[in-house]
């Protein structure tokens, strides 16, 4: 076997392989001998068909199969010999071939980039230092009560915390626009569901009043014909309702899995959940900064085949989220996923090099901690832990998570880390908007 390797462009490679005629003929003869033992041809007993008859009947197809097999096997041998690391499916191109002669073919493919990590010491990371305070727990308890609140009609003026039932008609330059009119529309205030200024215009008015508010549609509004336009809304306020928060009774508290129904037990459970969320938020905040720094410090060429594969994964995930099928997933525009796919591939290559160069292996103790942390959010944590321990695929997925964490921590150990005190709400709001 003769092999030559050339670079086509960037990460592209072309391997040219020549297989000697005697290798081909030996393989063809061997396959014909095997075929002669199995084929059935009228006039001959099974296994007694003369070789010349077998060759005449099956020679062409056997030779074709042999050439296909030799192409694949010799390519594998070639890349092992040349220490080439291909990515994606190779593209085989057979050359001209005459029976009894040598066979030359080419294989084109991309290779993984050579990654040499640099700039780790220059990565800057701001690590949040956060404590869950009693005031944070109070705020979370208020949120839980609001989620379970009932509504009671009131005759006072509307506030930003109320629920309003309205009729409205919107117009631009005196013309009512499509989608700008509704009756008995129930609006929970303070959730920013409407365009800026709409809810503010309702505050201070009472049920039974009719009034007009002036607002501007945002420049990035989803409807093209309304972007940046000034509009007027005539509003009839039909009903104002205020929240009635439930008391922290034993019955109410038990809904949240606190067996003894005590306020102390509820506060302890809420604090535990908040601290678990906080730990994850801090970890993700630090991880994002580490990965951003790693990407910015290491500009690497990315194989198109890897990006294509990641785009397919993201397409299928998007289709599953919205109830679509695989065919619909493949029809989603590539541009929707290309940037995210490239980032994921780059992160994978860089962290892969961190893992390889530092000879990292998944820490089983860390794997167990990760499973326990995840399981603690379920009603029966032990059942979840046992389920993971018996599921090899899930266990390997968690090992990959642990290994990624270890790689991030390895980079973090070399980075410039500055601690910054922030409040629980500040950090969680940053996490939500990131």
Curated annotation (Swiss-Prot):
Gene3D superfamilies: 3.10.50.40, Trigger factor ribosome-binding domain, Trigger factor, C-terminal domain. InterPro entries: PPIase_dom_sf, PPIase_FKBP_dom, Trig_fac, Trigger_fac_C, Trigger_fac_C_sf, Trigger_fac_ribosome-bd_bac, Trigger_fac_ribosome-bd_sf, Trigger_fact/SurA_dom_sf. SUPFAM superfamilies: FKBP-like, Triger factor/SurA peptide-binding domain-like, Trigger factor ribosome-binding domain. It holds the Pfam family Trigger_C. Residues 161-246 form the PPIase FKBP-type domain. It is an enzyme of class 5 (isomerase). It comes from Pectobacterium atrosepticum (strain SCRI 1043 / ATCC BAA-672). Involved in protein export. Acts as a chaperone by maintaining the newly synthesized protein in an open conformation. Functions as a peptidyl-prolyl cis-trans isomerase. Its main location: cytoplasm. It is found in: Cytoplasm. One of its GO terms (biological process) is 'de novo' cotranslational protein folding. This is Trigger factor. One of its GO terms (cellular component) is cytoplasm. The keyword Oxidoreductase does not apply. Belongs to the FKBP-type PPIase family. Tig subfamily. The keyword Cytoplasm applies. Its EC number is 5.2.1.8. GO terms for molecular function: peptidyl-prolyl cis-trans isomerase activity; protein folding chaperone; ribosome binding. It catalyses: [protein]-peptidylproline (omega=180) = [protein]-peptidylproline (omega=0). Keywords: Cell cycle, Cell division, Chaperone, Cytoplasm, Isomerase, Rotamase. Consists of 3 domains; the N-terminus binds the ribosome, the middle domain has PPIase activity, while the C-terminus has intrinsic chaperone activity on its own.
């Amino acid at each position: 076997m003769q092999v030559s390797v050339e670079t086509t462009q960037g990460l592209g490679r072309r391997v040219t392989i020549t297989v000697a005629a005697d290798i081909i003929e030996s393989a063809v003869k061997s396959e014909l001998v095997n075929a002669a033992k199995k084929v059935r041809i009228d006039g001959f007993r099974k296994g007694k068909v003369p070789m010349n008859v077998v060759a005449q009947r099956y020679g062409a197809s056997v030779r074709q199969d042999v050439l296909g097999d030799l192409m694949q096997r010799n390519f594998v041998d070639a890349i092992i010999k040349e220490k080439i690391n291909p990515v994606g499916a190779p593209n085989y191109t057979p050359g001209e071939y005459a029976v009894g002669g040598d066979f030359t073919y080419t294989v084109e493919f991309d290779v993984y980039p050579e990654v040499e990590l640099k700039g780790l010491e220059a990565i800057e990371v701001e690590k949040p230092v956060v404590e869950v305070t009693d005031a944070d727990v109070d705020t979370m308890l208020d949120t839980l009560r609001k989620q379970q609140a009932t509504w009671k009609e009131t005759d006072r003026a509307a506030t930003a915390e109320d629920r309003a039932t309205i009729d409205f008609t919107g117009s631009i330059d005196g013309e009512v626009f499509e989608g700008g009119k509704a009756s008995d529309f129930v609006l929970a205030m303070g959730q920013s569901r409407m365009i800026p200024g709409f809810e503010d215009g309702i505050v201070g008015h009472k049920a039974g009043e009719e009034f007009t508010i002036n607002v501007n549609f945002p420049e990035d509004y989803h409807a093209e014909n309304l972007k940046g336009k000034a509009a007027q809304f005539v509003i009839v306020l039909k009903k104002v309702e205020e929240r009635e928060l439930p008391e922290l009774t034993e019955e109410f508290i038990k809904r949240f899995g606190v067996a003894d129904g005590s306020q102390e037990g509820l506060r302890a459970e809420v604090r535990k959940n908040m601290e678990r969320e906080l730990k994850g938020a801090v970890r993700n905040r630090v991880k994002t900064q580490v990965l951003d720094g790693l990407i910015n410090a290491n500009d690497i060429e990315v194989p198109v085949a890897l990006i294509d594969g990641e785009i397919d994964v993201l397409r299928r995930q998007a289709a599953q989220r919205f109830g679509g099928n695989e065919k619909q997933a493949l029809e989603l525009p590539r541009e929707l996923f290309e940037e995210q796919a490239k980032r994921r591939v780059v992160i994978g290559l860089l962290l892969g090099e961190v893992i390889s160069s530092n000879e990292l292996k998944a820490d089983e103790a860390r794997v167990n901690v990760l499973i326990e942390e995840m399981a603690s959010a379920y009603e029966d944590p032990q059942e979840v832990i046992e389920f993971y321990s018996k599921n090899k695929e899930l266990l390997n997925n968690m090992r990959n998570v642990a290994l990624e964490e270890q790689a991030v921590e390895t980079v973090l150990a070399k980075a410039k880390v500055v601690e910054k005190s922030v409040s629980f709400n500040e950090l969680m709001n940053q996490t939500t908007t990131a």
